[in-house]
Amino acid sequence: MKKVLILICGFYLFLYILGFIIPQKITHPVLERLSKPVTIAHQGGNKIYPDESLLAFTNAINMGIQVIEFDIHRTTDGIIVINHDHTIDRLTNGTGLIREMSWVELQQVDGAYNWSPDGLTYPYRDKGIKILSLIEMMDAFPQQLYDIEIKQHDPPLEKDLCDLLRKYGVAADQAIVASFRDETLARFHDICPEVATALPVNQGTILYILSRVGLERLLPLDAVVAQLPTTFSTKLGQLELDRRYINAFAKGNRQVWVWTVNDSIEMKRLMNMGVHGIITDRPDILMDLIHHSKEYAN
């Protein structure tokens, strides 16, 4: 009798452990809109047109890019704006931290004053290019998929972002939110659980370790997408993105996107490795590769 009980207990323990190890597929509305390979225009394609400008986003969308990636901050008067850097110094003819400026002040600068395709010419100076607000983005491209990176963390803007996405009805199936700060992503997910989020940095490191021994299912994940470079720095040192890591994350119906890839040979290598999406400054190169590839062309 004792042996039978031990066997029964052992059997249920086995099932319990198995339940953690066997991946359970996630479902999310945003995943249903993505087709492999997922094409993502980094800052709209900032090697073609000025970073995160209406010109860049329009060009990428007209090419057929699935997702446009951009970064957000908030002004002193509460407007969420699109800009890569914390300051406006690099690209505009102004200076200052965005979080210390008003929307009116931002609209007074030339958004592409210092942008150059070759380091010698400045073709978009005095062309009326302005820093965009998130509202302007959603008004211009109401059906587009957005990959939104929260850059500002102090003061936090997660609630304002969630409120705005909900107001415009894009929360459930149009937005993926990312951040290099794990605490920022955690706060946003708590406030806005219906919106897809990217893999936090620390979880990415743990997942890498577990994937080496086939125990990736032991790590509970809320993320639907991992956005990674091919080589990433961790407390363990430099780690290389490989097929094992991609497969470990993808088992739960999740996706791996790689940034920032501007070379067609590298794009093809990564797609052949199993990467789901390519984040690029050159959407023209990526779309040309897909259109001329029998494997990826529709």
Functional labels for PLM-detected ranges:
Residues Q43-G44, D51, S179, Q203, ...:
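Glycine-rich beta-to-alpha transition loops that act as phosphate-gripper elements at the mouths
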Residues T39-A41, I68-F70, Y146-I148, A175-A178, ...:
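Hydrophobic faces of well-ordered beta-strands that scaffold small-molecule active sites
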Residues A186, D263-V275:
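Catalytic cores of alpha/beta
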Residues P283-N298:
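C-terminal helical cap(s) of enzyme catalytic domains, especially alpha/beta-barrels
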Residues I22-V38, L54:
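N-terminal signal-anchor transmembrane helix
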Residues A56-R74, A140, L219-A226:
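Catalytic domains of carbohydrate-active enzymes, especially glycoside hydrolases
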Residues I6-F11, L15-I26, H84-A196, L219-G252:
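Metal-dependent phosphodiesterase/phospholipase catalytic core, i.e.
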